[in-house]
Amino acid sequence: MGQNKQHIALEGKGLTLGYFHQKSKKEILSDLDFQLFSGELTCLLGPNGVGKSTLIKAILGQIKPWKGEILIETQSIENLGVEELAKRISVVLTDPVFPGNMTVGQLVALGRTPHTGWSGKLNSTDREIVEKALSDTKITYLRNERLSEISDGQRQKAMIARALAQDGKLMILDEPTAHLDLVNRFEIMELLRDIAAQKGKAVLVVTHDLDIAIETADRFWLLNCGTPLISGKPEDLIISGKINLLLPGEKYRFSVERGKLESEIQDLRFEISGPKELVFWTRKAIQKAGISEVKSPILVEKDPFSISLGEKKFDSIDGLIFYLKIQIDPIK
């Protein structure tokens, strides 16, 4: 019921996209229907080459649909000029190129270009918006730092601040966590989620980072070859099994119990007992080592940690795996 009351910031209806190669037409995506809601962080996921970049180009007005239409708040993007689109959609690309001697403050101020023109003269309102963008992304202290002298994570926050200063109702980001470490990836995605929720913006992120997307996204768009775009809450898509449409073949599956991508579990022929969390990690290590059969029962204990295998006892999983491998292939 709540979804019917949500504000639709962007909508695609019966969208077919492709390009011309020499004299032939190559269709990439067909009959797509989707809605992007204000106040939500939506993650677009799919294998390489499935058409994610093509879809983003269409949303940005860079390519025209063969069929169907894209609407921004009920207006067709084909009726909006470049300047108007720039005021409505803020974009952060994967590897933007900016002069290394440009400061963070100068970069963020560029976000006001669609509103000031290329003269770049900021009035008091523009300056307030730039300051707010720096504050909202918690990088005010970096205002005078050069882009070449800050970390990748800080640079990505500066790019997001520039997009905030642009003040579009839609924000589109292409792999914003690429090249970042684990903590920074979480931090950037949490920042984008907060921006969507607190500022009522519709935020669309193209990503391959499934684990972090599950933790932060309000909605997923799933794309795969030959199938319609699937939209839904990550949790609904996991429970229904639709999340597995992202996975090739049957080698991998998404574990509903553990909330992560795993190799398809092989037929394991051994008995293991002990505290649940210790059993899980011990079993995982044995499976990863390619060992499918252990003749004696395994007992895992903690405080202190130990693993018993018949009369043998080990104080680490590493020791157990080493021993099991010797039993399988004693020559080594």
Give each language-model segment a name.
Residues S124-L142:
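Conserved ABC ATPase "signature" region
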Residues G249-I331:
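ABC ATPase nucleotide-binding domains
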Residues G68-S76:
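Conserved ABC transporter NBD signature motif
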Residues L45-P47:
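The feature captures the beta-strand-to-loop junction immediately N-terminal to the Walker
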Residues R146-I150, Q154:
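Conserved ABC ATPase signature
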Residues L60:
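Helix-to-loop junction immediately C-terminal to a conserved catalytic motif
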